[in-house]
A protein has these predicted regions:
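P-loop NTP-binding core
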Residues: 1-204
Length: 204
């Protein structure tokens, strides 16, 4: 922000489960305003991550559910975006606006940006309402964008993890949410392998 370079490894925490984290803090809330008058504001995060990418196989950016400058920064540096959508009517309505933002970023900033898929979260298949939202999103977008078969169910145990400071795999390793994320990981990786095969076949 102030033109000073960031030392390598600054702010990175090494977690016992084998991942590195850069946690957010309360100051992030004011960063959105600070970016308004910043030169090259859409690529501030890219400048930081370009130096760190060589150290990692994958970097995951967890964005807030908003379409502000922080989210635009994440889209500007990302290779692909996985879009989580809560199984609620208002979240489903907001999906179209997010997709428009992705298209705009692709046109103006990051032409290589791809949509990995849509992930339904906090689902409850036991209720008619939950099934209706699932059908609504799959019906509206499933022909254009991959909607993952695996969903992430609503769970009290998952809601507890922020308070206990553990991942769902530590806190409730055999629970339905942990199992759902394992299944999702397999689905994402399988989808990526299919895409790589299609690219290889086109190149022959």
């Amino acid at each position: 922000m102030n033109g000073q370079s960031i030392p390598p490894g600054e702010g990175i925490l090494h977690h016992a489960e084998g991942v590195d984290l850069i946690p957010a803090n309360i100051e992030l809330a004011g960063l959105e305003v600070s970016l308004v008058n910043t030169m090259n504001r859409e690529k501030m995060l890219k400048q930081v991550l370009d130096g760190a990418k060589r150290e990692y196989d994958f970097i995951l950016l967890d964005c807030t559910p908003s379409l502000g400058m922080l989210t635009v920064n994440a889209l500007a540096v990302a290779d692909t975006t996985l879009i989580p959508v809560q199984a609620q009517y208002l979240s489903a309505k907001g999906l179209e606006q997010l997709l428009q933002t992705v298209q705009k970023v692709r046109r103006q900033i990051n032409p290589k940006l791809k949509i990995e898929g849509i992930l339904l979260t906090m689902t409850d298949s036991r209720t008619n309402y939950g099934q209706q939202i699932d059908n609504l999103i799959r019906g509206a977008y499933g022909s254009k964008i991959k909607v993952f078969d695996q969903t992430i169910p609503r769970s009290v145990r998952a809601a507890e993890i922020s308070a206990v400071g553990k991942s769902i795999f530590q806190h409730d390793p055999k629970g339905k949410v942990a199992e759902a994320y394992r299944s999702l990981t397999k689905e994402v990786m399988a989808n990526a392998e299919k895409q790589l095969k299609r690219v290889a076949e086109r190149g022959r």
